[in-house]
């Protein structure tokens, strides 16, 4: 009833429990005599229809018994449905040093409170809601309260000057450092990074591409790459032990090879003692404008065909990830 001529019901149930869509492959030899897997769309469609029947059958069975239904509902609510997102109230915040001609709206004050008290924060307001002022006000309050030493704002390259103007519009007496295109030319980069590291600035504003030119220390990069290799090695071993699809195993092996090559390249680099690393800047708060530019970060998962989960990785995304991990370490998840 729940199997096909190409795959039995037990295997379909196993794939379903592992959050995988069933796929049926035929194997052919290419011109070089290598065995190649080709998706059989017809058999896959039949198998996936059986998979949906199993899911629906399980769902019908779960809810058929009133006692079981009540018990499972209670367990689910106690374990997963008992957390209510915290609401933040910023009505009490004074905003010392803010331009008296400007008054933040209620949602902006609450967003600042969220940043102050809630740790890592995503500002997902609509365009025009005032996210720039929210970040600027939060940065100044963090500094005033002694909760941060120096904030770094990473914004689209063409908006650095606009950001600086809006920052000073909201806080006219703020001491900020703004990067220009010349500051990150090879001959000037070390001097500018030195200014960031030694200056007592309220905030530093740089462009996305400039941010990528400030490296993490080789030791930290190596540790993170080694951790990724370890995760991929475990994933490959698990798939082989469970007789996972050859395609999935090859995909992980390609990812492992790519990360291993990155590690080898990193180990071959000659250390440049005159390079100022990100850790040496003294930055302990990071504000990213237009953060959706940093997508396609590799994530190991058993799930397949999930929108938004990339199997390849953008260099700028992995660079930001490393820097965020470092800031979380030194701030307790508030970087």
What residues fall within each predicted segment?
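Charged, low-complexity intrinsically disordered regions
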Residues: 1-82, 172, 196, 200, ...
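Conserved pre-motif I regulatory segment
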Residues: 74, 79-124, 294, 303, ...
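SF2 helicase/translocase NTPase motor core
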Residues: 92-103, 131-132, 143-328
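Short, hydrophobic/aromatic alpha-helical segments in well-folded domains
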Residues: 107-110, 138, 150, 323
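Walker A/P-loop
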Residues: 118-140, 149-152
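Conserved helicase ATPase motor motifs in RecA-like P-loop NTPase domains
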Residues: 127-128, 290-292, 332-335
């Amino acid at each position: 009833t729940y199997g096909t001529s190409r795959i039995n019901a037990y295997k379909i149930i196993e794939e379903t429990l592992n959050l995988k869509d069933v796929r049926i492959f035929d194997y052919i030899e290419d011109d070089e005599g290598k065995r190649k897997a080709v998706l059989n769309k017809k058999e896959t469609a039949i198998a996936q229809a059986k998979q949906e029947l199993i899911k629906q059958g399980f769902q019908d069975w779960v809810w058929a018994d009133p006692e079981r239904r009540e018990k499972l509902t209670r367990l689910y609510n106690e374990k997963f449905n008992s957390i209510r997102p915290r609401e933040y109230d910023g009505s009490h915040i004074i905003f010392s040093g803010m331009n008296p001609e400007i008054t933040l709206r209620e949602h902006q004050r609450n967003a600042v409170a969220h940043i102050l008290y809630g740790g890592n924060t995503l500002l997902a307001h609509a365009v025009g809601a005032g996210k720039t002022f929210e970040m600027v006000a939060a940065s100044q309050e963090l500094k005033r309260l002694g909760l941060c030493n120096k904030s770094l704002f990473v914004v689209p390259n063409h908006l650095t000057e606009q950001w600086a103007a809006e920052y000073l519009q909201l806080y006219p007496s703020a001491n900020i450092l703004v990067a220009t295109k010349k500051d990150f030319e090879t001959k000037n980069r070390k001097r500018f990074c030195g200014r960031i590291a030694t200056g007592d600035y309220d905030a530093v504003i740089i462009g996305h591409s400039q941010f990528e030119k400030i490296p993490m220390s080789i030791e930290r990069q190596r540790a993170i790459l080694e951790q990724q290799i370890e995760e991929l090695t475990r994933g490959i071993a698990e798939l082989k032990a469970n007789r996972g699809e050859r395609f999935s195993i090859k995909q992980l092996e390609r990812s492992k090879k790519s990360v291993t090559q990155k590690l080898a390249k990193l180990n071959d680099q000659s250390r440049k003692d005159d390079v100022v690393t990100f850790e040496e800047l003294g930055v302990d708060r990071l504000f990213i404008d237009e953060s959706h530019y940093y997508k396609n970060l590799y994530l190991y998962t058993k799930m397949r065909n999930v929108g938004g989960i990339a199997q390849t990785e953008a260099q700028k995304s992995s660079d930001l990830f490393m820097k965020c991990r470092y800031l979380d370490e030194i701030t307790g998840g508030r970087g």
